């Protein structure tokens, strides 16, 4: 399994829907990746609400909070991590992108994405191709798709190293 420094991070930029935050927390916990939240959030983010939003996954998730984008950028830069923005405006499809160990997948605010300055500071941007005429996916659905592609391309799913590629886990019903 990849060392913690080389596992991807999932990052949410100023999320404003608590249910999406909870889903991202669960996604991060189940896939054993850190969830970084760039504040301010559009909802109070205290211990009681964290527990409620993340159900029983809050304790298993590696949640890291950043006061603002500058603080987040400093943390990612300390570990020499590339920021990969998930954007409807990107030209590169997420499934044709060359992910690297330690990439940070950054999802924008549900209502507005990220400011141009944040987008410009990212090392890459990817999009999920959609049916013509439709705008976007739910932010956590998009993040899950991109994170899955990133992890699959590097053999980073929990158990991959022990199991090899012979067989995978089946979805629980």
Can you say where each PLM-predicted feature lies in the sequence?
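Post-transcriptional modification and biogenesis factors for structured RNAs
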Residues: 1-173
């Amino acid at each position: 399994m990849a060392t913690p420094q080389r596992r991807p991070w999932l990052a949410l930029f100023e999320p404003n829907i608590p249910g999406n935050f909870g889903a991202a927390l669960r996604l991060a916990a189940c896939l054993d990746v850190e969830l970084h939240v760039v504040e301010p959030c559009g909802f109070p983010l205290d211990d009681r609400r964290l527990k409620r939003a993340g159900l029983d996954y809050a304790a298993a998730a590696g949640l890291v909070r950043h006061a603002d984008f500058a603080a987040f950028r400093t943390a990612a830069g300390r570990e020499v991590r590339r920021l990969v923005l998930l954007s409807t405006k990107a030209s590169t499809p997420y499934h044709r992108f060359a992910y690297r160990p330690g990439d940070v997948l950054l999802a924008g605010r549900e209502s507005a994405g990220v400011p141009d300055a944040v987008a410009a500071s990212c090392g890459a941007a990817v999009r999920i191709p959609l049916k013509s005429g439709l705008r976007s996916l739910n932010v956590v659905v998009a993040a899950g798709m991109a994170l899955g592609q990133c992890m699959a391309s590097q053999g980073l799913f929990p158990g991959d190293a022990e199991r090899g590629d012979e067989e995978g886990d089946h979805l629980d019903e």
